[in-house]
């Protein structure tokens, strides 16, 4: 829908036909783009599996590729965090857009006794969120994209419970239109590292809480993820922030910020399975990605017997 609106605006500006095009289609359309000799570069956003498919197929046909894949974004909470503000940022990150965005925070990693302080504040604020039509005033969590997505998200919640987690907030039966594809904000605590809800991208309003003993354990846990898109740390310690940003294997880091996406003049930068390619989206990387460079060496013999060289 967003793309459709953007292209309607572009049409209203009087751009010549064919300068930009919106093409909808399935695998045949995608393969045609990836293989066409008339297309020099491909930029993709989607799941890790499809990102790898796009990257490998387009690269095999000599194209420049940037492929943004999946994510499992961790939000690390230290005991000295300002819990009220931390809870607000976590809620916005995890449940905004019903968790259906690559920068959604989906795992809280609490150090020491931080969960004891955070839990009552976070649970109280989450319970106040209203589920319903996202266009209605006062609604905090809208629908997920389809019935199939709803079923998939609910199955992850059940799997989390089967793997030993408990529900701090149960969003399986939200008070919303039963004909819609709704899942309420859900918080699973007691999640064990290595389980499905701890490792896999759910892409819904489900938040997993993992408790660890030390800062060392927290950093190690984040770095075991196959993804490296974004992460946040909540603390008032500058020393902890410096260590975290130096040691964590993630492309975008937020400090007391729930959604660690930078403004667009900085690169949008994932690592590991979150990104395939050399030049990232946004910033100077994006300019370089869509630029072909030439270096010209020339000389003019009228400047002297051997000429004078110029490099442009």
Give the ranges of each region predicted by the language model.
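Active-site phosphate-binding strand-loop segment of PLP-dependent enzymes
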Residues: 19-50
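ALDH superfamily catalytic-core signature
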Residues: 16-19, 41, 48-192, 215, ...
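Conserved residues at the C-terminal ends of beta-strands
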Residues: 26, 45, 93, 235, ...
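Short hydrophobic/charged patches on amphipathic alpha-helices used for structural packing
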Residues: 30-34, 87, 219
């Amino acid at each position: 829908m967003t793309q459709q609106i953007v292209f309607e605006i572009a049409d209203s500006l009087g751009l010549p036909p064919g300068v930009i095009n919106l093409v909808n289609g399935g695998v045949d359309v995608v393969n045609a783009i990836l293989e066409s000799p008339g297309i020099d570069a491909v930029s993709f956003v989607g799941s890790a599996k499809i990102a790898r498919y796009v990257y490998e197929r387009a690269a095999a046909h000599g194209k420049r590729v940037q492929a943004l894949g999946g994510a499992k974004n961790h939000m690390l909470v230290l005991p000295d965090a300002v819990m009220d503000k931390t809870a607000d940022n976590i809620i916005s990150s995890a449940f905004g857009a019903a968790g259906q965005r690559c920068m959604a925070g989906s795992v809280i990693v609490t150090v020491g006794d931080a969960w004891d302080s955070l839990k009552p504040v976070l649970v109280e604020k989450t319970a106040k969120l209203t589920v319903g039509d996202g266009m209605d005033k006062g609604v905090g969590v809208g629908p997920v994209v389809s019935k199939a997505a709803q079923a998939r998200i609910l199955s992850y919640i059940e799997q989390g419970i089967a793997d030993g987690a408990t529900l701090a907030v149960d969003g399986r039966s939200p008070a919303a239109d039963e004909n819609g594809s709704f899942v309420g904000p859900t918080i699973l605590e007691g999640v064990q590292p290595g389980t499905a809800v701890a490792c896999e991208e759910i892409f819904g309003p489900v938040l997993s809480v993992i408790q660890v003993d030390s800062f060392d354990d927290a950093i190690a846990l984040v770095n075991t993820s196959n993804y490296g898109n974004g992460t946040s740390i909540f603390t008032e310690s500058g020393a902890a922030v410096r260590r975290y940003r130096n040691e964590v294997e993630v492309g975008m880091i937020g400090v007391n910020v729930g959604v660690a996406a930078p403004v667009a003049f900085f690169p949008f930068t994932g690592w590991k399975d979150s990104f395939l390619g050399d030049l990232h989206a946004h910033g100077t990387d994006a300019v370089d990605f869509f630029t072909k460079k030439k270096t010209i060496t020339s000389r003019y013999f009228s400047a002297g017997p051997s000429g004078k060289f110029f490099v442009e």
